[in-house]
Regions:
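Catalytic core of bacterial c-di-GMP phosphodiesterases, primarily the EAL and HD-GYP domains
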Residues: 47, 117-124, 149-226
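C-di-GMP signaling machinery
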Residues: 62-106, 116, 145-151, 185-194
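Active-site core of bacterial EAL-family cyclic-dinucleotide phosphodiesterase domains
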Residues: 88-145, 182, 243
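Cyclic-dinucleotide signaling modules
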Residues: 1-90, 94
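Structural preference for long, well-ordered alpha-helical segments in enzyme cores
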Residues: 17, 21, 56-63, 125, ...
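Nucleotide second-messenger and two-component phosphorelay signaling modules
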Residues: 27-30, 70, 102, 114, ...
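The catalytic core of metal-dependent phosphodiesterases that act on cyclic dinucleotides
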Residues: 198-262
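Short hydrophobic/aromatic beta-strand micro-patches
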Residues: 3-7, 42, 126-128, 182, ...
C-alpha cells in the first residue's frame, strides 16, 4: 500500500498512471509490461482543518478498500456517506452478539404454493431483526455479517429456531411442510459443517424430511468441491438440498450436472 499527497491540479496525470502505464523491464527498454493499481482518492476540501493525519488516512483506507474489490485499475472517490456506512457496519458488528443473545432475530415463513392446487407445499425461512421496536431491513445487516463469520452464527441460530417451530407444530397436530433454511457460502471452508448442521437438527429431534438446506453457488473450484461434499453428506442423512441464486456463481453447468440437488 502506498499513500501520496499532492496538489489537485496533478490529479488527472496521477490517475492516468494508476490506471495503467507501460514499464520497461530490460536494459534496452524494448520489453514492457503494463502496470496498474487500484486506488481510493480523497480530495481534501478547501479550507478543511484536521486535528491529525489519521483523520485523512481513515478516509483513504475506507475508499481504497472499496477500490481493491473492483477490477484492476479501478479508482474510487471518497464521499462522506462512506464514513457513515463504515460507522454503521462497525456498530452492527459490535451489537450483533448481544442482539443474538437477546433473540432479537425472528423467523418469518414465506410459503411456497402449488399454483395448480393452491396448497402450501413448502416454506422458506426468512430472517428479520427487531431492534428498538423497528424491523432492521436485511440489506442493512446481512452484508455486514457476511464480512466475517458472524453470518454463520446467525444461520445456525435460524436453523435451530426452524427446528423448534417444526417440532412444536408437529406436537400440536398441525400439517407441516418442508422448510428451507439458507446457509451462506462462508460456511463451506468449515470441515465439520455437516456435523454442525446435523447436531442442531438431531438435538431438536426434528424429522429430517421437514428440513431443506439452501446453499448459494460458489465462486471457486475449491469451494465447489466443499459444496459437493456437503450436499452429498446432507442427502445421505435424508436432508433435502436446493441451490440459491443459480447462474451467478462458478461453473453453473457443473453445479447441476455433478451435484444431485433436490
Amino acid at each position: 500500500n502506498f499513500v501520496a499527497i499532492f496538489r489537485d491540479h496533478l490529479l488527472e496525470q496521477v490517475l492516468e498512471i494508476i490506471k495503467g502505464i507501460p514499464v520497461p523491464y530490460d536494459p534496452a527498454g524494448e520489453k514492457r509490461v503494463n502496470v496498474s493499481a487500484n486506488a481510493g482518492v480523497y480530495v481534501i476540501p478547501e479550507g478543511t482543518v484536521f486535528e491529525n493525519v489519521g483523520d485523512i488516512i481513515n478516509r483513504i483506507m475506507i475508499v481504497s478498500a472499496l477500490a481493491r474489490k473492483e477490477e484492476e485499475g479501478s479508482v474510487i472517490f471518497y464521499d462522506d456517506r462512506m464514513m457513515e456506512v463504515r460507522d454503521r457496519s462497525m456498530r452492527i458488528q459490535r451489537i450483533f452478539p448481544m442482539a443474538l443473545a437477546a433473540k432479537e432475530f425472528k423467523v418469518f415463513y414465506q410459503p411456497k404454493v402449488d399454483v395448480t392446487t393452491g396448497r402450501i407445499v413448502g416454506a422458506e425461512a426468512l430472517c428479520r431483526w427487531y431492534r428498538d421496536g423497528k424491523i432492521v431491513p436485511p440489506m442493512d445487516f446481512i452484508p455486514v455479517l457476511e464480512q466475517n463469520l458472524d453470518i454463520c452464527q446467525l444461520d445456525f441460530y435460524m436453523l435451530d429456531c426452524v427446528c423448534k417451530d417444526i417440532c412444536r407444530w408437529l406436537a400440536e397436530g398441525k400439517e407441516v411442510v418442508r422448510v428451507s433454511v439458507n446457509l451462506s457460502r462462508k460456511h463451506l471452508p468449515d470441515a465439520d459443517l455437516l456435523e454442525h448442521i446435523m447436531t442442531i437438527i438431531d438435538d431438536n429431534q426434528t424429522p429430517h424430511q421437514y428440513i431443506e438446506i439452501e446453499l448459494t453457488e460458489t465462486t471457486t473450484d475449491v469451494a465447489f468441491k466443499d459444496l459437493k461434499r456437503v450436499v452429498y453428506g446432507l442427502q445421505a442423512e435424508g436432508i433435502s438440498t436446493s441451490v440459491d441464486d443459480f447462474g451467478i456463481g462458478y461453473s453453473s453447468l457443473n453445479l447441476i450436472r455433478e451435484i444431485p440437488w433436490n
